[in-house]
């Protein structure tokens, strides 16, 4: 997941300041695990977005590369959109490249551009089929994901069924560039036709649209060889033109390429029984969103929380944490929460669309739209006043969590903005850690991170192989407001404090609780 933080994506112009902290040196633990170069073997889609170093403008890339399992990249292709270049999206081919995957799943991928230059990516693999990425060549601050493709499904008929999508980026629809989030569901017939659907658009230049019907449109794979070789094609959706790369029949990664702006994100096949009325939706869920304020200083904002739906339109046991441009607010169950409800959209039955809302005197009225990709997962969009954010929602079926139950190896990805005068800058982290069952000092690992402004104090603003240590502290039954303290080594060691919410499958959703940054992200268990 990658969010668009307004000052970083539209008007970043400043310098990199020191992160603070002392001179603590953290020795990275020796790489341990079952990963190797053989873990990256096959064709992979990568999807990333963030900020261009030179212009401070939004940049996004989606592409595919082939890895041979022995440290070599044999071919690749990407679409890249840099709104600071003044040029439309371009296509780049990769003639070859190299990579190295350590035993802990961390690695470095270097893609050689056929026309000259390279793209360097740091990765932390969850498994041989997926992982997190951060651009680590100092040319841009982008982050995203890498996913194993199934080349036998590089055809139009692989895109067949209902797909939930979540795109974020920049819009040119208003008088000035604005942040935009698009979430929704569309149907595809496997024969090149988008049969319709429903979407919610939150463009900071306008009011949120609410549920809007999608008209029929088309999609097709490239016929010049890029379709069969890399799974590339194009799609028209909601009046916008996208390039896409097929992961498999369950997932497609898209990049907007038109005059309306630029956005990117996944489309995920709906599976399982999707509720069509309130009685079909119950249980506990944790959620995380990130994005931007749309008034005041237009600063970054990230929110994390949880709730329990009762199957009858009510929500309770609400807990919520917000970092609004470094100003933090925590809402606990029973702390003046009112006007609570949820609704499954019966006018768009079968779309997976729903809403939930609550009110608290500290944060006002908070309202979200979600689209379920399965009974336990959804994409989510914040439509509260004066914010544009989006993110993820996951079920929280466990009644309690413990450090013993969470012990294991994790990959993580955090993105956000460090808030320094006179101008803030974008930051991205990717890494791996081992968590023990101890109550304290239970995290040790390694991270690569990029903290890019227009001028940097570090070489390219990138630090590789920084040791990390810290503690995940479980609060009560662990369903809400846990703390997650990480000390990060490098040229100048620093500490980042997070509030952490836990979801099914060991998912850890975090938002920074410090006043000097608005950073959020996710950690997920490694399965190899």
Give the location of each predicted region:
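Mature soluble binding/inhibitory domains
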Residues: 19-528
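Short, functionally important structural connectors and interaction interfaces within domains
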Residues: 8-11, 32
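Bacterial N-terminal signal peptides that target proteins for export
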Residues: 1-8
């Amino acid at each position: 997941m990658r969010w668009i933080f307004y000052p970083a994506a539209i008007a970043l112009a400043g310098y990199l300041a020191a992160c603070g902290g002392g001179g603590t040196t953290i020795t990275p633990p020796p790489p341990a695990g079952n990963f190797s170069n053989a873990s990256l073997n096959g064709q992979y889609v990568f999807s990333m977005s963030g900020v261009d170093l030179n212009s401070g403008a939004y940049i996004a890339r989606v592409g595919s590369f082939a890895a041979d399992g022995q440290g070599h990249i044999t071919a690749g292709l990407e679409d890249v959109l840099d709104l600071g270049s003044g040029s439309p999206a371009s296509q780049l081919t990769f003639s070859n490249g190299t990579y190295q995957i350590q035993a802990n799943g961390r690695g470095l991928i270097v893609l050689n551009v056929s026309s000259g230059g390279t793209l360097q990516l740091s990765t932390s693999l969850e498994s041989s089929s997926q992982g997190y990425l951060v651009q680590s060549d100092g040319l841009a601050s982008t982050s995203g994901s890498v996913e194993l493709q199934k080349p036998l499904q590089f055809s139009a008929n692989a895109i067949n069924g209902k797909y939930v999508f979540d795109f974020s980026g920049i819009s040119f629809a208003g008088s000035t560039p604005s942040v935009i989030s698009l979430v929704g569901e569309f149907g595809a017939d496997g024969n090149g036709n988008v049969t319709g659907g429903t979407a919610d658009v939150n463009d900071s230049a306008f009011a949120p649209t609410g549920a809007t019907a999608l008209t029929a449109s088309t999609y097709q794979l490239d016929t010049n060889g890029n379709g069969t070789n890399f799974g590339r094609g194009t799609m028209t959706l909601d009046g916008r033109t996208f390039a896409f790369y097929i992961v498999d029949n369950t997932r497609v990664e898209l990049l907007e390429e038109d005059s309306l702006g630029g956005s990117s994100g996944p489309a995920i096949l709906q599976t399982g029984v999707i509720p069509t009325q309130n009685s079909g939706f119950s249980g506990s869920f944790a959620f995380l969103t990130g994005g931007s304020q749309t008034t005041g200083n237009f600063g970054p904002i990230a929110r994390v929380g949880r709730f329990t739906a009762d199957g009858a339109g009510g929500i309770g046991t609400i807990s919520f944490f917000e970092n609004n441009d470094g100003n933090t607010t925590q809402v606990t169950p029973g702390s003046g929460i009112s006007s609570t409800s949820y609704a499954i959209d019966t006018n768009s039955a079968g779309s997976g669309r729903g809403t939930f809302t609550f009110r608290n005197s500290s944060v006002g009225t908070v309202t979200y739209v979600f689209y379920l990709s399965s009974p336990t997962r959804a994409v989510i969009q914040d439509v509260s006043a004066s914010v544009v954010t989006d993110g993820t929602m996951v079920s929280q079926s466990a009644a309690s969590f413990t450090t013993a139950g969470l012990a294991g190896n994790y990959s993580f990805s955090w993105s956000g903005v460090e808030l320094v005068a006179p101008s803030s800058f974008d930051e991205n982290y990717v890494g791996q850690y081992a968590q023990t069952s101890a109550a304290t000092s239970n995290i040790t690992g390694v991270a690569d991170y990029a903290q890019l402004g227009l001028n940097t104090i570090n070489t390219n603003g990138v630090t590789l192989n920084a040791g990390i240590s810290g503690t995940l502290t479980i609060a009560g039954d662990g369903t809400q407001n846990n703390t997650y303290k990480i000390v990060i080594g490098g040229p100048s060691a620093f500490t980042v404090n997070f509030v952490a919410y836990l979801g099914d499958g060991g998912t850890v959703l975090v938002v920074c609780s410090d006043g000097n940054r608005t950073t959020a992200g996710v950690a997920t268990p490694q399965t190899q």
